[in-house]
Amino acid sequence: MPDLESIVKDIAAEMRARPDRGAVASYIPELARVDAQGFGLVVIDGEGRVAAGGDADTPFSIQSISKVFTLTLALGMVGDRLWRRVGREPSGSPFNSIVQLEREHGIPRNPFINAGAIAVTDLILSGHQPREALGEILRFMQFVAQDDSITIDERVAASEKRTGFRNAALANYMRSFDVIENPVDYTLGVYFHHCAIAMTCRQLATAGLFLAYSGHHPLAGHSVISAERARRINAIMLTCGHYDGSGDFAYRVGLPGKSGVGGGILAVAPGKASICVWSPGLDAAGNSHLGRIALEMLVKRTGWSIFGV
């Protein structure tokens, strides 16, 4: 095992000093207020050992990283029937694109673009009131993070609802094909709220441990999902986890991962560790600019890329 503590602290110090930080998300007003100078990095292994650097305990809006956990939850509820409503292919398009959805008759290309995550949220909502569905998602996040203090930032959720016209268009378009079955306002309400969950790098890295250890959560002491399902979720994270920057992330970092426009990236080194990095400045594809650079440095120094040293 490499000296993770030194590696993480070195990377955090280098990232804090860099001037090229990207631009914070401006289309969600609450996210536009975030200080672009923040940077945190946490690596947690199966023994519970933690290497942390920078703003490891600063909460941030997890945004699309929540889609990993809603996918996990929905698969637990409906199994492979989920794939009748959502595909498993990279989109190659921006995360909120409606063009592809129109071409493919309302079936989203994968569960990590906005349309796909809205369809997955609709599956979780079925048979529940919105408050119940949201409570189930939040309790699952608290369980895998082993922290009951995790909450939803209501200001971010309200900000997303006020400005989420493109997401409303996606949801209504899918409703016209019966891909969405519940009232659109209900589905979007749950979606906006789970994207507005606030977590720290330490909490998110803990939450991802079950994906790093074949579905078994070493800190919780039992399996969350089967090894096969963990492997398949990791595969989708690798191919689809960074919108139209997914191929570049696989090329540069070589780990399954999921980004969010709040500046976080959850990455998985199978059998080795769960990693979360946060830096709110984004690149052109909506992924954390310094977060990707930091992960590239981490895999070079640890040899953790799934494609080899």
Swiss-Prot record:
NCBIfam families per UniProt: Gln_ase, PRK00971.1-2
Recorded name of the encoding gene: glsA
HAMAP family documented for this protein: Glutaminase (MF_00313)
Keyword set includes Hydrolase: yes
GO molecular function, one term: glutaminase activity
Catalysed reactions, as listed in the record: L-glutamine + H2O = L-glutamate + NH4(+)
Subunit structure: Homotetramer.
Any single GO BP term: glutamine catabolic process
Domain of life, per lineage: Bacteria
Enzyme Commission number(s): 3.5.1.2
Residue numbers binding substrate: S64, N114, E160, N167, Y191, Y243, V261
Alphabetically ordered keywords of this record: Hydrolase
Entry's family note: Belongs to the glutaminase family.
Keyword Hydrolase assigned: yes
Protein name, as recorded: Glutaminase
